[in-house]
């Protein structure tokens, strides 16, 4: 699949090749992303879904995993037309793969992450076992294992991308300044 490519000739040496899992509701956005070629593995949550658009745009994932019924769920959320339009613009360029909702379960995700990293807890990475984005982290790992028919062998750590620790530029600004891509 686009997010699980490992062939050298299909990878761009200049950019990461992220597979991202996304969960979105009125409480905010939760996501996790993984580059199987480098082992980079991270998660994040934001209370304002619009802030996540900046993260999503800067990561430029090759594939996004969403819970089944994501389109209907997105329609039912009252997040505003500007957000929905911008999300559709960003997602329009990316392969979207629906996964069963239980793949995004937070407790199962925590177990999956610990098992893949070979640890008993996530405190050494600064991540609480109750972190809401562990659901998407588990979904990314389960999907990668399904496609690869085994565990990714190069995962050593998981990092938390914290909202507020970096300057966030909205997608329109990123586009106009050509920060990540040139036209």
Predicted feature residues:
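Charged catalytic and DNA/RNA-contacting regions of genome-maintenance
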Residues: 1-183
């Amino acid at each position: 699949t686009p997010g699980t490519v490992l062939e050298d000739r299909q990878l761009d040496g200049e950019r990461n090749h992220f597979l991202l899992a996304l969960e979105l509701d009125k409480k905010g956005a939760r996501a996790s992303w993984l580059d199987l070629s480098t082992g980079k593995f991270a998660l994040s949550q934001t209370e304002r879904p619009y802030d996540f658009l900046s993260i999503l745009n800067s990561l430029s994932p090759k594939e996004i995993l969403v819970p089944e019924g994501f389109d209907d769920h997105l329609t039912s959320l009252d997040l505003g037309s500007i957000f929905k339009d911008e999300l559709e613009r960003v997602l329009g360029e990316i392969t979207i793969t629906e996964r069963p909702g239980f793949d995004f379960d937070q407790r199962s995700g925590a177990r999956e992450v610990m098992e893949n990293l070979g640890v008993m807890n996530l405190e050494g990475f600064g991540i609480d076992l109750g972190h809401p984005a562990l659901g998407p982290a588990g979904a990314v790992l389960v999907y990668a294992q399904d496609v690869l028919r085994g565990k990714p062998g190069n995962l050593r750590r998981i990092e938390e991308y914290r909202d507020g620790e970096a300057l966030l530029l909205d997608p329109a600004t990123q586009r106009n300044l050509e920060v990540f891509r040139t036209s």
